[in-house]
Amino acid sequence: FFKQKTAYEIGVRLVGSEMCIRDSSGPMREFLNSPDPTEAAALAGVHRRVARGLGLLATLDVGVRPEVSEEPVILAANHRSMADLFLAAAIFSEWGWPIRPLVAGSYFDRPGIGGLLRRLRCIPVRGSEALDIATEVMADGWSVAVMPEGRVVPEAEWAPTGVGTARPGVGRLALARGRPVVAIGVSGTERFWPRGRNLPRISPWRRFPLRIRHEVLGVMVGDQPSVALEEIMAGITRCIAATESPSELFD
């Protein structure tokens, strides 16, 4: 993880940037079961500023936003880089969708990055409480984003299939809540901000390409979290392949 001063500086630059790269692709989404509009609008503002800052360093291809008929939903993505957090905020800004990621609680205790996570309304997760916390947040109308691998995965582990070993929590959450699941595949962040580096790679001559694709998996059925997890990870794997394929995978 990066040094404390570096984390603070990156947070200020990404959240405080006023340079406009591009506007959101549409208005904020509203559903019958939506979060408090004032809180959602405040979060959307932070997402926009992060998107503008990240746009100075990388090109973003986030695709069309998922077509879901109701909220809240569970978004599940792979995790190759610390840049995934900032890319997530940019994605949610582009989609006009106030979504709250679950993040390991230990990061909130670190100066600089902890403040940024709170401004992004990330949900701190400590141990086995993840399912209860996510359930409470979704009951208030918020969609949540999770990274089933639970850590930044080394390339040696994800290279064979595109993903690392996942933890079972997302399978339990999907079955317990009975909400639609959207699989997301991310590529490019591992080159932009490689695992183990204190800073992303910054070049004055080019911006790193970051690409995501998604697939709406729908509601998980059955009573076996391991089966639900397997289906979710298979969806993420297909989406990762689509980021590197001429044919694009969308629902």
Regions found by a protein language model. Give the residues of each.
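Single conserved hydrophobic/aromatic residue that forms the stacking wall/gate
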Residues: 1-23
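Helix-to-loop junction immediately C-terminal to a conserved catalytic motif
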Residues: 43, 47-79
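Catalytic core of membrane glycerolipid acyltransferases/transacylases, capturing the structured
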Residues: 69-127
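Generic beta-sheet signal
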Residues: 71-77, 142-150, 179
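Hydrophobic/aromatic ligand-binding patch that stacks against planar heteroaromatic rings
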Residues: 91, 116, 136, 172-176
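Catalytic-site beta-strand/loop segments enriched in glycine and acidic/polar residues
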Residues: 137-171
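A cross-family acyltransferase "interaction/gating" segment
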Residues: 158-227
